[in-house]
Amino acid sequence: HYKELGISHVEGLVDSINQEKSEVNLHGGTTVGYDRLLVASGSTPVTPPIEGVDHPLVSSCWTLEDARRISEVAKPNTDVVLMGAGFIGCIILEALAKSGANLTVIEMEDRMVPRMMNDTAGNLIKDWCESRGVSVNTSTRVESITEVGGGLSVTLSDGKSIPADLVVSAT
């Protein structure tokens, strides 16, 4: 498909980009010319420095495999805590809300999607979530995650503890 559109896919480490010559200099000496350039550098999930975040019932949602593992646990009436209500967190939130799980969202900023939305828009999203039975906690941090019985207890910065069958990190 890409070849039909005249698009080349090149993987490698980039040493420099010469915009004047429309060239990318790759590590190892190869130079690749371009008409238009898209750099897709990829990324990796950030693991927050929270006690217990390495527990097997705590998952990031970064890959299709992660999403499948989460959907196996997030069933109706299970308790799920979602850490992070940014753009990606809200996409995950929607899927979790549809699962029928009892969903609690923890966002350390004062509103949902804080990097993209002002107070009004962030609060509209919060109201929408709460109207669908999602508990949203803003200006709150997860302090620790501990195993209790067969599940987890999530301790928050306001002193509350929330039971969880699964914690999803979208930080």
Predicted regions located by residue number:
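A general structural signal for well-ordered alpha-helical segments in protein cores
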Residues: T47, A67, G89, G122-K126
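Short glycine-/acidic-enriched loop or helix-start segments at secondary-structure transitions
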Residues: P48-I50, I92-L93, R115, E147
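A Rossmann-like FAD-binding core segment of flavoenzymes
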Residues: H9-I17, N25, V32, S99-T171
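Rossmann-like NAD(P)H-binding beta-loop-alpha module
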Residues: R69-M117
